[in-house]
């Protein structure tokens, strides 16, 4: 079926019950790397993404500029920590909803999250959420949610060979998801 519309899904606590595991692995990984003074008031950050929060805390702790080349080592350690925690479960019905829209409607699906890629793939796999890796956008190289969502939309256009989607709906659970959709002029659920 030709895809004419798009749903952009957030992942943590939208499709997967993973926010607690994510935060534990994330904060403990920062500590592993010597980032011990951590502002955990996530809503206070201008960009609620792993890369942006890591950047600001890194710079505050080490008094030097953050470089994205730090992300791969951080991501590896965070992934190890995620795998040591309880398995991620789906939000009830999430996998059925994703499958329904992908297989039975003219809605394409993509994923946009402020998390880092490797932990996200683990969460989706553990929760048995069907996904195409090329349709997952994360914060590995992008600091803002708006840019993450825009990149996910572009990936979906390429993957589904669509020049422009008639309607785009962002689905998320955080106030930052709502703000992002509003800033981009797309629908929000």
Positions of PLM-derived features:
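A short, structured active-site edge motif that brings together acidic residues
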Residues: 41-45, 71-72, 130-144
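Short active-site oxyanion
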Residues: 105-110, 166-168, 185-188
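Conserved H-loop
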Residues: 36, 130-134, 162
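Substrate-recognition element of Asp-dependent hydrolases with the DxDx(T/V) motif
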Residues: 94, 98-125, 135-143
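N-terminal helical cap/lid subdomain that shapes the substrate entry/recognition surface
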Residues: 2-9, 15-93
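Alpha-helix termini
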Residues: 62, 104, 154-163
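Acidic, divalent-metal-coordinating active-site segment for phosphoryl/phosphodiester hydrolysis
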Residues: 144, 169-187
């Amino acid at each position: 079926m030709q895809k004419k519309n798009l749903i952009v899904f957030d992942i943590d606590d939208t499709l997967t019950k993973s926010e607690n595991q994510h935060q534990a692995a994330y904060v403990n990984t920062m500590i592993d790397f010597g980032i011990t003074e951590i502002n955990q008031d996530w809503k206070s950050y201008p960009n609620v993404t792993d890369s942006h929060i890591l950047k600001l805390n890194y710079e505050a702790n080490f008094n030097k500029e953050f470089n994205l080349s730090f992300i791969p080592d951080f991501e590896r350690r965070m992934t190890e920590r995620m795998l040591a925690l309880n398995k991620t479960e789906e939000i009830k019905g999430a996998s059925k909803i994703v499958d329904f829209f992908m297989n039975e409607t003219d809605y394409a699906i993509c994923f946009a999250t402020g998390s880092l890629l490797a932990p996200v793939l683990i969460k989706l796999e553990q929760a048995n959420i069907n996904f195409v890796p090329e349709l997952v956008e994360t914060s590995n190289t992008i600091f803002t949610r708006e840019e993450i969502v825009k990149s996910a939309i572009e990936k979906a256009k390429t993957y589904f060979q669509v020049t422009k989607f008639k309607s785009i709906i962002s689905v998320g659970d955080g106030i930052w998801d709502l703000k992002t959709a509003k800033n981009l002029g797309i629908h929000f659920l």
